[in-house]
Structure formats: C-alpha cells, structure tokens
Amino acid sequence: MGVFGYITDLKTVCIEKYADVEVTGGDDESSMLFRFLDDVLFLFNAEPFLIPKVSLNSITHTVQFCFSISFAKKIEILEINWQEFRIRARCYGEVFNLDKHPQGTEVKAITYSNMQIHKKDDRVDVYVIIDI
C-alpha cells in the first residue's frame, strides 16, 4: 500500500498474519475513504503492523476491481458499499522489525486535502495526500 511504501521498502515485508478492518457510516465517500485509511495506518501505529497486501472478494454495487497503489503487491477489498459508506478489508502483512525493514519516513496522518475519488467502469482511482 502506498502509505506503507513511505515507511519501509515493501519488498522486505512478508505475509505472516492478517488483520480485518471494517469502516461503516460516514457522511460521504471521502469520509469513508479517510476513515478506512486512518484505521489501516492505526494498525501500524498500534502494533506496528505492515501491510503490503489487502484482500478483495466481492464488491457491492460496482464491478469487481483491484486498486492500483504504488508499492503494493496487490490490494483487494472484501466489500465496498458506496451508498452506505461501508468498507470491509482483510489486511495481510507482518510486524515492523528494524532488523529486517529499513526505516523510511514516518507517516503522521491521512488528510482530506485535495482528496479525490474517480470511479470508472473497471476500477476506482483515489488520490490522497498524507502528512509526513
């Protein structure tokens, strides 16, 4: 995931465990995306847990797609419902280890600044500025 690409070299991250993330509610699509990315960033700050991959089985009210985000091997979502502002995802990765993972830039926060969501027939492109 692009956010974790700032924190370390994702090529050094193995998939050893997973964490489920679910975001429900919100005022609009931007707030849903913000809350989801904020929860994913919280996984790193709480454990610290690195996520090079996130898993996708079905999409509600849209065509199945994969997000293309820099440095991610593959990003998949279990469910995304644009009308009810709900995202469910399974995040795969491992605990951050300074002996294994080179330390990059600290990501302080996700921001709403210039956040954009562009829905297309076969994918959704998102643009998010992070505070480093």
Which residues does each predicted region cover?
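Intrinsically disordered, low-complexity regions
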Residues: M1-I132
